[in-house]
Amino acid sequence: MTSQATPPISGASLATGQRSLGDPSVRFPLWPPLTAGCPVTSTESVSYPVEVDYAYDKVPTGLFTAAPGQPRGHERWAPLLPPLHAPGLGEGGTPLVPLGEGLWIKDESRNPTWSHKDRINRVTVSAAVGAGAEGIVVASSGNHGASAAAYAARAGLRCVVIGSAGTPPAVDAFLRAYGAVVLPVPESARWPLLRRIVERFGYHPVSNVTPTHTGHAFGPEGYKTLAYEIYTELGVPGAVFLPTGYGELLFGVWKGFAELVALGLADRVPRMFSCEPSTGGPLAAALRDGVPATRVPVGATAAYAISSAVGGYRGVVAVRESGGGALLVSDAEMEAARAELARAGLWAELSAAAGLAGFRRRGDAALDGPVVCVSTSSGFKDRDLLSAEGSAELDPEDWAEVERRIRA
C-alpha cells in the first residue's frame, strides 16, 4: 500500500526517499517504509539501518526562527520529518533545565506519556496510518510500548504490545488504559512472535525485527526534533550525553545537528556521548572492536530500559562522526545521578539518569560550549516504584521516628 491512502494531516514533508546507512548510494522510494533494515547492504552478520532523505534545498528559511503563532512540537518541524499522517498528542517542546553553570538537562519526562519515545511514535504510527495498516505491533516492556499504545489509540489503530511479566506498574497501567493487547512472553520469544503477527495480521511493526538493531526507517527522524529544540534555545552545545540502548536516540539527535550544518545554520555538531550500563555495552564494544554492530553478554542491572545485548550501526555512526565517545556507567553512578536530579526537582527513571551519570564520569574537559544531558523518562517508569518505608503507616505519636526520618 502507498501513502496515497491517507493524506498527511500536518505540514508539507520534504522527505524524498530512503537510503542505506551501510552504503548511502543505495536508495529506495519513500514508501513503503522499510522496517527490517536495508535489503541490499545487510549481511548475515550485520543488518544495516535505513534513514530518510530530504529536499534540503527547499527547507523554509524561517523554520528555525521563532515567530508568533508558530506551531509547536512535531508540527513545527514537519518539513524535516516523514509525512505526519497520524494526529499528535503535544509531543516535544520539553524544557532545558539548568543544572549548574554550563550544564543543562533536557527533561523528556514532560512528553505526553512521560518519555522521549513519544517523539518516535508520532512518526512510526504516522507511517502505519500512511501505509493503510489496521494496527501496530511493538516488542517492549517499557516506555516504547506505553507510548506506542497511546499514539495508536489516538490514530484509531489496534495495538499489540509484546512484553514480559516484569512490566513496571505505570507502564502496565498505560497499556491497559489505552486498550492495547498485552502479550507477556519470554524475552527470547518476543521477536519471532512479532514477526509472525506482522505476517499473519498485516500489522505495522514499530520496533525492531532484525538480529542486529535496525528499527523502523522513519523512527529516529522523530528524535531529530530534540536537536532542533536545543539549537533554537542554546545554539550548538559542546556535547550531548544520552542514555543509550539500541542507539536510535543517539543517532536521531546527531542527525538533527548534522542537518543544521548541511543547511548552513551551524558550523559543527556537538560531540555525542553514549551512556550504557556497564553490565553490557554493545555500542562501546562495537566501537572498541571497529565493527558495525556486535552482541555482548549482559549482566544484571536495574536500568532495564537501556539494557541490551545487541546494538546497531546507527550509534556507531553518531559517535564516530561527532568525535564523541562511548561511556559505561554503573548502577551506583546512575543512582547518584538520579539523586542529583531529584535534588534539583527532576524525578527521573534510573535509565534516564545515565546521561548525567556519563557526564559526571567523564567530566567537562575539552568540551567546547555548554553540555546537555538528556533525561529520557519519569521516575514513575521504574519497576521498583514504592519503598517499604514510604508505604507503611507511621504512628504520629512516635516522635523519635518522625525526627529520625526528618534528619536522615
Positions of the model-derived regions?
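PLP-dependent amino-acid enzyme catalytic core
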Residues: 2-408
